[in-house]
Swiss-Prot record:
Name of this chain's protein: Probable dual-specificity RNA methyltransferase RlmN
Cofactor, how bound (note): Binds 1 [4Fe-4S] cluster. The cluster is coordinated with 3 cysteines and an exchangeable S-adenosyl-L-methionine.
GO-annotated biological processes: rRNA base methylation; tRNA methylation
Positions annotated as active site in the UniProt record: E123 (proton acceptor), C367 (s-methylcysteine intermediate)
Enzyme class: transferase
UniProt organism field: Lysinibacillus sphaericus (strain C3-41)
Compartment(s): Cytoplasm
Amino acid sequence: MVDQKKFNERINDLVEEAEEKPVRRAKKEKPNLKESIYSFQPHQLEDWLKENGEKPFRAAQIFDWLYNKRVKTFEEMSNLSKGLRDKLAANFALSTLSTIIKQESKDGTIKFLFQLQDGYSIETVLMRHEYGNSVCVTTQVGCRIGCTFCASTLGGLKRHLLAGEIVEQVVKVQQTLDEVNERVSHIVIMGIGEPFDNYDAMMNFLKVINHEKGLNIGARHITVSTSGIVPKIYQFADEQLQINFAVSLHAPNQEARQKLMPIARAYKLDELMEAVRYYTKKTGRRVSFEYGLMSGENDSVEIAEELSALIKGIKCHVNLIPVNYVPERDYVRTSRSQIFAFEKTLKKNGINVTIRREQGSDIAAACGQLRAQERSEETR
């Protein structure tokens, strides 16, 4: 098991060294919030009902109201007694997120900025594809990993999200899709924050949305990404889930990676690759390497050759991502011609590779951008 306290201290120290400024630490205590009803797995809700003098079969009825009928008040749960509805309302929140901004791109992408009960804001993105509707969820308010090209780390980490706050992002998006008779078919845990830094809440979220009585989203339609918290990769591999797994790599050698990603100082590239090999061997599943291309930093043909050598023999796929412009960062997006040259080199070396389709650029849909814009406007 990971010593979370030591890990927190280690990453905070490394990010402070890399950024030369203090990192805002997450609150150690849980915020004083009303617990979301969406935090429960069915058996957990059954236990709560029994402890409060109610029949456990009511859990299935409550789940039906939450995930099939998608009610917005406890009063709408008409097959429950008034007494039970009152108990639920007294103990839980049915809505912990309120919509601050909802923007729709010309390509159909919808970006949501939600406000939490304690006033913090988070982002969620609905992306439309030929194969269905994908939701990118956030797992933390801010991020402390400190990647030097990312908008999510601006302002540091405020707190971890609770499982119900992550689930409710998907529910809110589904309520929007209900208006056009569509459904959420895919989930990517690639929004603001490091999912493996909020591991328990992430796992609870996965079990709720994957459950047949929950949102019933198939495991193979869910992808979780990490910046490279090595001990958690081993733990995730041992879970033996059918969920897709991605690693934010962004560089093929230790020196370049730790410049872009301070976490590489805590967990060296060779340690990360060893953990990835363990994952593929343990699960039999491939890993996706997320690779953000930045002009003059990590996009040369020579670096593509180095990347090919690094991952050769691993059951994997490379997802090339042209980085988005972030005003507070100095990196420049790689040219289209260089992106294609990089892709061609990987393919020549037998690497399975795709270029991520850009979506929602006209509404700041990249991770952390809308939240950063809102924070900037608030401080003017």
